[in-house]
Amino acid sequence: SLAGRNLTYDTWHYHHQNLDFIDLAQAIPECTMILDHFGTPLGVGTYRNYRDEIFQEWRTEMRQLAKCPNVYVKLGGLAMPDNGFGWHKADRPPSSDEFVAAQKKYYLHMIECFGPERCMFESNFPVDRLSISYPVLWNAFKKLTADFSADEKQALFYGTAERVYALTD
């Protein structure tokens, strides 16, 4: 098993698969699992006109997932085209302020549910570069956490990833 080998399980899936992931996390509590890209709340195709409904459903599912102490979350990937913000088609990419205005509610909800000690920022590059530049994305993360404590910022920008992935000796 992954847990027996001190390995983690990362998953990237779409919002309509969140309940299956919750079942998996509950079934194998000894395995450390990482949810990538927020469980991607889709905003394209048949989902493009349901952003508010999907957000409400997603919020409820993330609260439920946060009850699984073996689950951590990577906060990033919302700039990719799948989420339906349309930045990859725009005349110019969003500024960090525009990014924060559009996506703050997703980030803050995850941090509220899981706590900074179970969240880590991630860039999802090179895919995100279709919509946003690397420096602008990380500046947006800094703006999102402007009112956070030094310990909370340390967890989000480095500490959680260091601990979960055993990046130190």
Which residue ranges define each predicted feature?
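Mid-to-C-terminal alpha-helical segments outside catalytic/metal-binding sites
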Residues: 105-109, 113-120, 127-169
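Catalytic pocket-lining loop regions of alpha/beta-barrel enzymes
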Residues: 1-120, 131
